């Protein structure tokens, strides 16, 4: 009996608690422990940013991205917390960086070559471990990229000049198709059709309905922007994402019909052309077993949507800037006359068009279309003194960086900003390094071709003094004009008309 009384296991510890501990003490200890965990979590990162605050911080930051759009949210947080700061997206730590030294480090190194985004969202649009734009399968991405690089450089780039000039002339001769009853030109639609037509001739080579495909591309792009950062729960509520799923399916179905026609032509051709285009190269890679049919279809889709999605909007913004800055237009026209004269532009003119080139650069700096780059850290690293852990998401706010460092008049549109050579670490419209834009060279050449060919023929004017600064825009994955605005059309005045000659 005595031994049992001395044995601590003899007692019911739970029943003894009230005797040795006040009732309120346990909740206080639990709360203290929880707050200590939260405090320790926040203390693990010295990077500026909103507080964790028992999980409320991550929830608020993700909601802000969904509500404001990626671009606006990034600018908000950089302005609030500095040029190297931390938030959370989908509960994952995410850095937003607009500091040139940090961007240079990230773009330079291969352990930042992966991107991030909702897996379910990327699966819905066909980009999860597929294509090139958001493909995070490093082995497949490395196998696919050479097809894009080959098609977008060398002989393909040279051929693009002739093809693009022909497409522009054809579409300018049919301006009534993209003009309203007052003769105002829907420039966005015009540019999208030119870009799609040029891309199709170069990379696929199958006749298509430009008008219908352009609409489907816009639907696909809207779905891409909407789904990229959505939480997983969004995809469990079918009525929320069905319209986006349909938009993706519409474009994929249309593209599949075109690609099947391409396969048929290849299989029935007696002799292949000496120069195989992008689609043919991919289809032969599929026949060798290097790629799947799904890989081929997604790569061709991405190749055809790239220019109508981004470059067309870039040229649209450029034409608005030209309309507002007559002295810039005058300088451009003098150079065009001196270099090109009355003939069509050629590939050997490109290096001589310095004013046009600086205008393109300044337009992309002042009013970017793609102003964000999304990456993921594949290993632990130190960036500008901050520890960046493996798996950390990173958004490079390039558009903001272009207005913070180096340029003498960062908040003005002026060619003075490119009067001197700009070190490439301070100006990255296409990125650089292992994951830079595969089409950066052909994009520059194509924009020169479009501007020279169009401006030789027309002087452009906006409606009611509409300008870039006052234009309603959507700040998402890329920056686009709000197309519900009624003042996005332009007036094209023929250069040889009396109205233009009187200027």
Swiss-Prot record:
Enzyme category, top tier: oxidoreductase
Transmembrane stretches, start-end: 19-39, 51-71, 303-323
Q: Where in the cell is it found?
A: Endoplasmic reticulum membrane; Microsome membrane
**What is the residue range of the signal peptide feature?**
none
Pathway(s) the chain acts in: Steroid hormone biosynthesis
> What does the protein in this record do?
A cytochrome P450 monooxygenase that catalyzes the conversion of C19 androgens, androst-4-ene-3,17-dione (androstenedione) and testosterone to the C18 estrogens, estrone and estradiol, respectively. Catalyzes three successive oxidations of C19 androgens: two conventional oxidations at C19 yielding 19-hydroxy and 19-oxo/19-aldehyde derivatives, followed by a third oxidative aromatization step that involves C1-beta hydrogen abstraction combined with cleavage of the C10-C19 bond to yield a phenolic A ring and formic acid.
Q: Family assignment?
A: Belongs to the cytochrome P450 family.
What is this protein's name?
Aromatase
Instruction: Quote the gene name from the UniProt entry.
Output: CYP19A1
